[in-house]
Amino acid sequence: MENIIARRYAKAIASRADINDFYQNLCILNSAFVLPKFKNIIESNEIKKERKMEFLDSFFDIKNSSFQNFLRLLIENSRLECIPQIVKELERQKAFKENIFVGIVYSKEKLSQENLKDLEVKLNKKFDANIKLNNKISQDDSVKIELEELGYELSFSMKALQNKLNEYILKII
């Protein structure tokens, strides 16, 4: 449910001319969500909405009236806890708008930056998009490239290769 709500807010922000200002301000607030005290203040029903607004305003040196109105809207609808999802969805929509996609390469060993760049260049050509890859270590002997936003997944494992070789050899015999 929160993802649907976050998607609507992010879509509205993405259509604005000052999307980058909103995004930067939301990132500031999003970074505060790791603090338990901050979350307690945001989620508390005992703290008045005006005090919450003052508290959130204290995070910013330069006041943006549009962003303040957005925060008031979130406060009035008790949706401040949706800020992390809004930021995540906004990042996704910004990347889609700018034709930038983030993917993950799962491998048993850490890949060098050179290998990651080489994979990025090849995927950039294939999808005609700007692909950024991150490497995550997995326990499998396989290598897997996942581009969730594009619905693309490529997997290569030694077991699968051995099985295909065995099948091929058995067909020949």
Curated annotation (Swiss-Prot):
UniProt GO cellular component terms: plasma membrane; proton-transporting ATP synthase complex
Keywords: ATP synthesis, Cell inner membrane, Cell membrane, CF(1), Hydrogen ion transport, Ion transport, Membrane, Transport
Annotated membrane topology: Peripheral membrane protein
InterPro entries cross-referenced by the UniProt entry: ATP_synth_OSCP/delta_N_sf, ATPase_OSCP/dsu
Matches recorded under Pfam families: OSCP (PF00213)
Subcellular location: Cell inner membrane
Keyword match Membrane: yes
NCBIfam families, sorted: ATP_synt_delta, PRK08474.1
PANTHER family with a match to the protein in the record: ATP SYNTHASE DELTA CHAIN
Subunit and interaction comment: F-type ATPases have 2 components, F(1) - the catalytic core - and F(0) - the membrane proton channel. F(1) has five subunits: alpha(3), beta(3), gamma(1), delta(1), epsilon(1). F(0) has three main subunits: a(1), b(2) and c(10-14). The alpha and beta chains form an alternating ring which encloses part of the gamma chain. F(1) is attached to F(0) by a central stalk formed by the gamma and epsilon chains, while a peripheral stalk is formed by the delta and b chains.
Family: Belongs to the ATPase delta chain family.
Function: F(1)F(0) ATP synthase produces ATP from ADP in the presence of a proton or sodium gradient. F-type ATPases consist of two structural domains, F(1) containing the extramembraneous catalytic core and F(0) containing the membrane proton channel, linked together by a central stalk and a peripheral stalk. During catalysis, ATP synthesis in the catalytic domain of F(1) is coupled via a rotary mechanism of the central stalk subunits to proton translocation.
The protein's name in its UniProt record: ATP synthase subunit delta
Organism: Campylobacter jejuni subsp. jejuni serotype O:2 (strain ATCC 700819 / NCTC 11168)
